[in-house]
């Protein structure tokens, strides 16, 4: 297992909805909770998880994101915005994903993400919890 990860929204959303790959995400969350892996999350990622999961039940999603923020150390957008902007300028990538990438770079961590190809060709170590989208 990696020493440090910066988690993207896709794994957390998959875990919330028990999608394919949720078991792998659970293992990572467990490793972070037990202190075996240093976990980082950006505030932009928290925002994405909250609004996507909140489409079904806003209060449950709020509680879930609150727990996530207890599991992972939070990096603010302010901390990495310039690095995120440079990444967005150089690559065709979703705005939320650049904040995961910038957080991984800032914290010398592996970007933990899903199957989307936004992370391809970026100068950051990537680990995927699944190879196919849902």
Locations of regions flagged by a protein language model:
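Acidic, PIN/NYN-like endoribonuclease modules and their adjacent C-terminal/linker elements
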Residues: 4, 74, 101, 106-134
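Short, well-structured alpha-helical segments
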Residues: 62-66, 81-82
């Amino acid at each position: 297992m990696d020493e440090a990860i910066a988690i993207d929204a896709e794994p957390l959303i998959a875990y919330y909805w028990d999608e394919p790959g949720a078991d792998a995400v659970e293992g990572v969350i467990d490793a972070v909770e037990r202190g075996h892996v240093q976990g980082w999350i950006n505030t932009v990622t928290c925002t994405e998880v909250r609004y996507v999961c909140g489409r079904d039940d806003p209060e449950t999603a709020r509680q879930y994101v609150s727990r996530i923020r207890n599991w992972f150390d939070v990096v603010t957008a302010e901390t990495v915005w310039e690095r995120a902007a440079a990444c967005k300028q150089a690559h065709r990538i979703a705005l939320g994903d650049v904040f995961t990438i910038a957080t991984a770079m800032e914290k010398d961590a592996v970007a933990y993400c899903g199957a989307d190809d936004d992370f391809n060709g970026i100068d950051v170590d990537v680990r995927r919890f699944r190879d196919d989208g849902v």
